[in-house]
A protein has these predicted regions:
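Gly/Ser-rich catalytic/binding loops embedded in alpha/beta enzyme cores
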Residues: 2-163
């Protein structure tokens, strides 16, 4: 695993420029994102499904790095974004056995950009709570103050970005 220490200093466009100019390898951003998730998520609880193998396979299939975000890792919100052969739980244990047979339009568009879906972010049950504290997974913590939770249906995404 190759960790790109300055990963957090760049946005997606900046990372794409580094990849295209061969200053970093296409695998560096993904390895760095995985490292951050593994180090920070036990404390934050913002990623409820890790899809590292899928992301690596997507990168291997896109050797030509096609798409404006080719090689850039991302989290997919686990709410109304179906991902083929994976559950879409929407923060609920009720849907734990609901495997989606297809990528929905939004997921297909993300894939077309070349982005690598490396996980699904935490959401409150069905997006109906003002904080991200689903019974199934437990609360998502604010990275700036872990005594607090994150709010809204994008709490997992918000915590991941803020971390």
């Amino acid at each position: 695993m190759s960790i790109f220490k300055e990963y957090r200093d760049y946005d997606g466009i900046g990372l794409v420029e580094l990849i295209k100019s061969k200053q970093i390898s296409p695998l560096d951003p993904l390895d760095s994102a995985i490292d951050l998730i593994e180090r920070l998520d036990p404390k934050l609880n913002c990623v409820h499904r890790k899809l590292y193998h899928d992301a690596t396979e997507s990168l291997n299939r896109n050797k030509n790095l096609e798409g404006v975000f080719a090689g850039i890792p991302m989290l997919l919100k686990d709410m109304d974004s179906s991902l083929a052969n994976h559950p879409m739980m929407q923060g609920s244990s009720y849907l734990k056995n609901t495997t989606m047979p297809y990528d929905n339009i939004l997921t297909k568009k993300f894939r077309k950009t070349g982005a690598l879906i490396c996980g699904k972010s935490a959401t409150p049950e069905y997006g109906l709570m003002i904080t991200t504290e689903p019974v199934k997974f437990g609360p998502t913590r604010n990275p700036w103050d872990t005594n607090k939770t994150t709010g809204g249906s994008s709490g997992g995404s918000a915590a991941a970005v803020a971390a």
